[in-house]
A protein has these predicted regions:
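N-terminal secretory signal peptides that target proteins for export/translocation
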Residues: 1-9
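Generic alpha-helical secondary structure signal
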Residues: 8-9, 20, 427
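Noncatalytic, solvent-exposed loop/strand surfaces
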Residues: 23-438
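Hydrophobic h-region of N-terminal signal peptides that target proteins for export
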Residues: 13-24
Length: 438
C-alpha cells in the first residue's frame, strides 16, 4: 500500500499550525542530538507506573525495536505490520555467556509467510494521538533476523524538514513532516544473519548509511533532498556489525566513526575518505560510539567485549587511549554523563567507570535484561529493562537508585526525551511518561 494520511484525511494547515509547540528540544534520531543519549532539560519524571504519571499509551500499527524520535510536536515511530513465520535461520546457534549460561539466541527466516507492510507513524507529543501514517509494502527478499526484532529496527532520523526511515530489508523512504513521500529507494537485498540494525545518520545535508553485511560491506552517503548518491565506500568482505555511524568533531575536522568487527574506522563524512583505523579481534559489535569532551568511547564486540577510549584526529593505524577488558555491553551503547561512563548488559548489571582511565567506580546488579541504551539528564540516569522496569539512578560516583518504575510491557527500544517527557516504545505500543511539556 502506498503512503497515506491517518484516516484517509489530508491534514490541514490549520491543524498543523495548532500542533506547533515552542521551547521543546527535538530528539531527531538515534539517541538524540549527537547520538549522546543526553538532554539538558530539567524537571524530568522520577516515579510512574501503568496507572500513575503516564500521559498517554497509544497502540502502534505494528511491532519493532526502532526508537521513537521527536521533531517539533511530532513523535515519529517505525513499525513492521505483520509477523515473520518463526522457522530456524540458516545457522541457528547457542550464544552462551559462560558465567550466566545465557539463553539460546536464534535467527529466524521467512521466505514465505504473509505479506508485510513497513509503517511510519507520527503522533502528537502532547496527547499521543495519531497525526499521520505512511505505509509501503515490504518487497524483495526477506532477510533472516534475530528472534527479538524484525525489519523495523533502524531508528528514523530527521533534519527538521524531512524524516528518513530505513528498514531491515533495505527499503528507504524520505517523507516530509506531513507524511508525504519525497523519494524512495531500495538498497536490498540485505544479508546479515541476525538482521540489519544500523540506523541512518545525518551530516550537513547528507544521509549516511552503514551496510556491514556479508558478502560485501559498504558505507553510503545520499543527498538528503533527492536521494542521489554523493559517495560510496566499499569496506571489504566478511565485515558484520549493527552499530550506527556517529559524527564527531576532531582537531583536524569532522570524522564519521564506525564501530565494526575487525576494527574501528574513521572517515571524512563529506567525502568518505578513510582517515584512520584501529584493529581488533572482537566480532559483530552492536553498540554505537559516543563522543564527549574530546574522547570517543565504544564497546567493541559481542558479549564480554572490551571498552575502548580513542581520540579523533589521527591518520593511518592508531591505538586506543585506554582499554577496559571484558567490561563492555552486548547491545546497549555507552552513556557518558557528568564525567562518568555508564554501561548496562544482558545480565542486569550496570557499571560506572571513570572516563579518564576506564577504572570501575561502582558496579550494581539491578536484575533484568538490558537491550535499550541508557539516557540521562537533570542529574539522573535512566535504564530501561526488557521487561519494562525503568530504573532511575542519581548520577554520581555512588550507586543510588531513586526509583524503579514498571509498565508491564516488553521494551527493547531506547527512550527519547523532549519537553520534560520521556517517550518509550514497547513492542506494539508508545508511552509518554511525565506531565511537563514546554
Amino acid at each position: 500500500m502506498e503512503g497515506h494520511y491517518a484516516g484517509g484525511v489530508k491534514i490541514t494547515w490549520v491543524l498543523w499550525a495548532a500542533l506547533a509547540v515552542a521551547g521543546a528540544a527535538d530528539w531527531p534520531g538515534w539517541r538524540g542530538v549527537g547520538s549522546l543519549g543526553l538532554t539538558t532539560e530539567t524537571g524530568l519524571p522520577v516515579e510512574w507506573s501503568a496507572g500513575k504519571g503516564v500521559a498517554f499509551r497509544t497502540e502502534l500499527a505494528g511491532t519493532g525495536t526502532s526508537s521513537p524520535i521527536v521533531v517539533g510536536d511530532l513523535v515519529i515511530v517505525t513499525s513492521q505490520a505483520g509477523s515473520y513465520e518463526t522457522g530456524d535461520g540458516s545457522d541457528p546457534r547457542l550464544a552462551r555467556d559462560e558465567r550466566t549460561l545465557a539463553v539460546r539466541e536464534r535467527a529466524i527466516s521467512a521466505k514465505g509467510g504473509p505479506a508485510l507492510e513497513l509503517v511510519v507513524e507520527a503522533f502528537g507529543r502532547r496527547d499521543g494521538k495519531r497525526v499521520w501514517e505512511y505505509r509501503m509494502a515490504a518487497t524483495g527478499t526477506r532477510p533472516e533476523v534475530h528472534e527479538k526484532h524484525n525489519l523495523a529496527t533502524p531508528t528514523p532520523v530527521s533534519d527538521g524538514e524531512r524524516v528518513y526511515a530505513w528498514f531491515g530489508n533495505g527499503q528507504l523512504v524520505a517523507l516530509d513532516l506531513k507524511g508525504k513521500m519525497i523519494w524512495r529507494k531500495d538498497l536490498g537485498p540485505f544479508a546479515n544473519q541476525w538482521g540489519h540494525g544500523s540506523s541512518p545518520a545525518l551530516y550537513k545535508g547528507l544521509l549516511v548509511l552503514l551496510v556491514d553485511h556479508r558478502p560485501a560491506a559498504y558505507l553510503l552517503a545520499l543527498e538528503g533532498k533527492t536521494g542521489e548518491v554523493k559517495w560510496r565506500v566499499d569496506r571489504g568482505k566478511g565485515r558484520v556489525s549493527h552499530s550506527t555511524p556517529v559524527v564527531v568533531a576532531g582537531p583536524r575536522g569532522d570524522e564519521l566513526i564506525v564501530n565494526s568487527d575487525q576494527r574501528v574506522d574513521a572517515y571524512a563524512p563529506g567525502t568518505g575518505e578513510l582517515l584512520w583505523w584501529a584493529g581488533s579481534e572482537r566480532q559483530t559489535p552492536i553498540p554505537s560510539a559516543v563522543f564527549a569532551d574530546g574522547v570517543i568511547y565504544m564497546s567493541r564486540g559481542y558479549r564480554n567485549s572490551d571498552i575502548w577510549a580513542m581520540r579523533p584526529g589521527g591518520r593511518g593505524e592508531v591505538t586506543p587511549l585506554w582499554r577496559m577488558a571484558n567490561g563492555g555491553s552486548y547491545v546497549p551503547s555507552i552513556l557518558q554523563y557528568q564525567g562518568l561512563l555508564y554501561m548496562t548488559n544482558e545480565v542486569g548489571v550496570v557499571t560506572c567507570a571513570d572516563v579518564a582511565t576506564g577504572a570501575v567506580v561502582w558496579k550494581e546488579r539491578l536484575g533484568g535484561i538490558f537491550f535499550a541504551s541508557p539516557v540521562a539528564g537533570d542529574g539522573k540516569v535512566y535504564l530501561l529493562s526488557e521487561t519494562g522496569e525503568m530504573y532511575v539512578l542519581r548520577a554520581g560516583r555512588k550507586a543510588e537508585v531513586l526509583a524503579k518504575n514498571e509498565l508491564g510491557e516488553r521494551f527493547l527500544a531506547s527512550p527519547a526525551v523532549s519537553g520534560g517527557r520521556i517517550y518509550l516504545r514497547g513492542d506494539g505500543v508508545l508511552f509518554g511518561v511525565g506531565g511537563a511539556q514546554r
